[in-house]
Structure formats: C-alpha cells, structure tokens
Amino acid sequence: MGNQSLVVLTESKGEYENETELPVKKSSRDNNIGESLTATAFTQSEDEMVDSNQKWQNPNYFKYAWQEYLFIFTCMISQLLNQAGTTQTLSIMNILSDSFGSEGNSKSWLMASFPLVSGSFILISGRLGDIYGLKKMLLVGYVLVIIWSLICGITKYSGSDTFFIISRAFQGLGIAFVLPNVLGIIGNIYVGGTFRKNIVISFVGAMAPIGATLGCLFAGLIGTEDPKQWPWAFYAYSIAAFINFVLSIYAIPSTIPTNIHHFSMDWIGSVLGVIGLILLNFVWNQAPISGWNQAYIIVILIISVIFLVVFIIYEIRFAKTPLLPRAVIKDRHMIQIMLALFFGWGSFGIFTFYYFQFQLNIRQYTALWAGGTYFMFLIWGIIAALLVGFTIKNVSPSVFLFFSMVAFNVGSIMASVTPVHETYFRTQLGTMIILSFGMDLSFPASSIIFSDNLPMEYQGMAGSLVNTVVNYSMSLCLGMGATVETQVNSDGKHLLKGYRGAQYLGIGLASLACMISGLYMVESFIKGRRARAAAEYDCTVA
C-alpha cells in the first residue's frame, strides 16, 4: 500500500526526470491531475506526503509560535481586503452616483471595475511570484493598493466618475498581486494534505464573508453619517492595507525557494490573455449602458474572442513555459472545477449587486442598514470555512464543492422571490445564511485541491487559478445580469422586474455549476472506490 500511495503522490505532483530541471512529460497518465488527486485522498498517508515534500519544507521558517500566528494573521487580512475592496462601493453606490452625477445604468461599473482588473491580472501576478519571488510580488501589490485607494478618495474633488472607475481598476490591480501570492506562500510553507495547511487555508477563506461585511458596513456607516465624507471609506481601506503591508514585511519568511527550476515569464501569452479578458469584460459591462446595437461594442467583442482563442492555441501548442501548465489545460477534471467556480461565483456576483439595488432602491434602506444586513455572512461564513478545515481529511473536497454550488443556487432562487414588504428576518436572513456556505465551502475546497495537486514551483499559480475564476466571473457575469435587466425593465420604469430578471440569470448560472460539480463529485467517488480496491488488492497480494 505504501508503494501504491507513493506512486499516486508522484503522479499528482508531476513526475520529473530530474528535479533540478524543467518538468518532463512522461505520459498522459502522469499528467492527469484530476484522476490522481482523487486517488491520493483515499490512499496517501500524511507521513508519506511529508517525506516526499521534504525538499520543499524548511523547518526554520518560524522560530517561535507567535511568528507563525502573525504570518497567518497577515494572510487572513489579505483575503479580508480583497473582499472588502469588492463590496465597499455597494452600500454607497447611490451616494457615489449623486456625487459624480452618474447615469443609473453606469452603477455596475462602480463594482465591476475592481474585480475586472483583479481577475484579469491575478493569473499573471501568481506566475510572476513563482518566478521573481512570492513575497516581492505581494509587497508590490500592497504598494499599488495603498496608493490607488487614496486616489479613489481623492477622485471626489475631480467630479469625474470615469476617474473614479479607473482608480478602482488600479486598486483591483494591486489586489491581484496580493492574494494569489499569499496562497502561494502558504502552499510552499505547509505540507500538502496536512491538517495544518487545511486549517490555515480555511482561516483565510473565513475572511471572505468578514471582508465583504466590513467593506459595505463601514462604507455605509460613513455614507449615512455624512454622505460628503464617503472618501474616508477608501482612506480607511488604504490605512488598513498599509498596516498589513508593514506586518507582512516582518511576518512573511524571506527564505521561500524562488524559481529553482529556472522558469521564464510567458510574456506573449500574458499579453494575449490579459487583453482578451479585459476587452471581453468591458463589452459585457458597457453594452447595457451603450446598447448592443452600437458598432464598437460588436467590434470589441469580436476582437476579444479572437485574442482569447489565439491565447488558448498559443498556450497549448507554442508556449515554452505556459501560464497554465499543460497538465491543467488538458485535464478535464481541473476544467470542471474551474467551470463550476466560474458559474457559481458568477451567480453570486449578480446576487451581490442586485441585492443592494433591491435594498437601496426598492426597500429604501439607508446605506448603513443595507450594509448591516450583510452581518449574517460574517457569522455563518466563519462557521462554513472552519467546517471545511476540520473535516477536509474525512470528506472529499468534491463534496464541499458540490454543496457550495447548491448553496449558490438555492440562495439565488430565494433572492429572486423575496417579497418587497417582507421583514429582513425571514426570507433574506435565510438567503444570507445559505449563501455563506456557497462562498466558504467553495473557496477553501478548491484552493486546497489546486494547492495540494500542483508542484511547489507552481504554488503562486495555484493560488491564482482560484482567484482568477472567482474575481473575473463576478465582474463578467454582472455585466450579463445588467444586460438582462436593461432588456426587461422597460427603460427603467419597472426596476423590480429588471432586478428579478438578472437574478433569474444567476439561477441559471448556479444550476450549471451544480450540474458540473455534481458530475465531478460522482466521478471522484467512482475513482476513489477504484483506488481503494486497488490498494486493498496490493495489500492482499503482499
């Protein structure tokens, strides 16, 4: 059984002819990460994982327990800032629109610009971290976040919503360099498959609902107290980022191995991918404002598709060091996981925006009360994330992934039928609790899958994969939701009808996520059963 387990682990990590050189592909079986990760969960012991990863583990990363705790704290705050940055405009979107004199249809850009850029650049930032140093890229990201968060507040005095939206985009660019490199550092420091690593990733995942809650709540508090002081929501965000920047300098080890396989950056693929992603996202978020009948919208859409098709072909056939390892690109199970995350979090992005539209414009809540209704995310999100950390050794990640998509679907359905005059403590309270499990089962489970089953030299990229899908899908699908809204709201005369229409699209996306993740879960169980049977047979023969 020990030999069988070691073989499975070698397959899941990527088998190399020489560990000091670039990985050499031996066979299609060696590169089928999706199959090996399932078998690993059933046949591999923790001790074997430690031994096989010893080359990558430095026992002197932390001399004292408090150093490790401080490191974990800085990682958690990084995730908090990511989600807070996404939601901090939601509770004050009407205040921002009034301040800049924005048109109603352009409100989606107040939220979408941040995840658009962060989602488009995260994959590149993770690869840059793998090549030039995870900690270096993390600190670069914080510098960008600090500067552009301050500029977001200063844009008030320009009176230009375009300037604000661009500043939000650069704020998202900074976050793109923070979170994937944080997860990459965790992947390098902690041994894959161990309880310690799982619980740390779960702690980081638990910060998503906390960040989402604090972002909209704090901004709502400032906006309700004095709408003219809304820039302080961004000044405070910048201060928090600066504090964590300083802590990260001292808390994050500087001895993490950097690019020992001498990879180079795939600049051609990076340019093709980023341009394609940004243009596609721009089209979907701008079309509801300008109209799909505009020639430039159609032209940009065609150009974006061409860039993305060329990017995929280049990465598969021509790139010497592709942004995505070919084992991931060609592995059906990895694609399944990413598609499930895309549709699930896309539906959540639609819910998030139209939830606040519903609260502010239909129920006429104040910015503070609208932000305060997110409080259930804080409580139940922590519970959900810790549930993953404490049970992941006994429950397949595919199970958590499936039920997280079910939570996204059920939450979207409940949001689409919430009565206007019903108290918050009925349907909406239940919706928030259920959606908490959508967020905080999917993020830790998928992060653990990718981190444990990719080689250590790809840990920055492993963190990038999950965050790219999460952030980009929230922005892109929001544009799709806005398109549906504008088509059914009778030129803004029936707001509720438009909001419901967007939520129905979210239900459709979440349903697709359920089907894809359900198929992956069933296949995982079948392969796990086969792996156990093979292991038992080996023991019997021995």
Swiss-Prot record:
Record has Transmembrane as a keyword: yes
Glycosylated position list: 471
Membrane topology: Multi-pass membrane protein
Keywords from the named record: Glycoprotein, Membrane, Transmembrane, Transmembrane helix, Transport
Extracellular side: 130-136, 194-198, 253-262, 317-333, 393-399, 451-505
One GO location term (cellular component): plasma membrane
Regions that span the bilayer: 109-129, 137-157, 173-193, 199-219, 232-252, 263-283, 296-316, 334-354, 372-392, 400-420, 430-450, 506-526
A GO biological-process term: borate transport
Subcellular location: Membrane
Domain notes: Deletion of the C-terminal 34 residues abolishes ATR1 activity, while deletion of the C-terminal 23 residues have a minor effect.
Miscellaneous remark of the record: Present with 1720 molecules/cell in log phase SD medium.
Function, as annotated: Putative component of the machinery responsible for pumping aminotriazole (and possibly other toxic compounds) out of the cell. Probable ATP-dependent export permease. Appears to confer resistance only to aminotriazole.
Family classification: Belongs to the major facilitator superfamily.
Name of the protein described by the UniProt record: Aminotriazole resistance protein
Native organism: Saccharomyces cerevisiae (strain ATCC 204508 / S288c) (Baker's yeast)
